[in-house]
From Swiss-Prot:
One of its GO terms (biological process) is translation. It comes from Synechococcus sp. (strain ATCC 27144 / PCC 6301 / SAUG 1402/1). One of its GO terms (cellular component) is cytosolic small ribosomal subunit. Residues 235-244 have a biased composition (Basic and acidic residues). Belongs to the universal ribosomal protein uS3 family. This is Small ribosomal subunit protein uS3. The keyword Ribonucleoprotein applies. Residues 225-234 have a biased composition (Basic residues).
Amino acid sequence: MGQKINPVGFRLGVTQEHRSRWFADPNRYPQLLQEDKKIRDYVRKNLSNAGIADIRVERKADQVELEIRTARPGVVVGRGGAGIDTLREGLQALLKDSSRQIRINVIEVERVDADAALLGEYIAQQLERRVAFRRCVRQAIQRAQRAGVQGIKIQVAGRLNGAEIARTEWTREGRVPLHTLRADIDYAYTTATTTYGILGIKVWVFRGEIIPGQEDAAPSNVGQPRRRNQQRRRQQFEDRSNEG
C-alpha cells in the first residue's frame, strides 16, 4: 500500500520525525491539536512570500516553541528581528493568551530545489500565472535534478490548461521507492487557484536511502561540483527573547 498512504506518516519513527512534539492530558488533546493547525495556517498565510517549507511545534509547560524552515529567512526575521516580534504578537492574539510565551526559531532550508513543499509551491505559482502545466512540471523536475535528488514524481489534477473535463496527469524521473522504509521520501500536497478552478499538486522527492548509523553523514553534492567552494553558511535565527 505504499502508493496509497502518506509517505511521511508511513515513515514516522523510522526516517521522519513528528511535526508536533508535545504531550498533554487526553482532555486537552483536541484543543492543542486545533491550536497547532491554527498556528500553521496563520504563519503560512502571513508569510506566504517567504517560502515556508515546514513548521514544527513543541510545547513545554506554558511555552510554545516554533521551528520554521524557510527558503527566505530574511523575510521571516525582518529588519532587526521586527518580523519575529510582529509574528509573535499576532500568534498571541490568535491564541487569545498574551501570557503564553512563544519562541520562534527560523532555519534556512539547505537545498531549496530538493524540498517537496517548495517545489509544489513553485508549480502552484506558475500555474496561477497561466503557464502551461507540462512546462511547469518539466522546469520543477529540472530544478530538482540539478539539486541532486535521486528521483522525483509530480502529479497535477484538475481542469488542466482550462480543459472542460478534469483529469489527472503525472510524471516521474528517476527512482521513487515508496515501499522502502529507509528511503528518504519527502512528500507535499498543495493547491493552485486558477480562473478555471482549483488544481491539486502532489510532489514526491527521493533524496536517497538512510542507512542506520549514517544519518549524520554529509549530503552528497551530486550535480553541484562547481559550487563546492561557494557554499555559503546556512542562516539560522534562534529566538532568545524570553530568556531571563
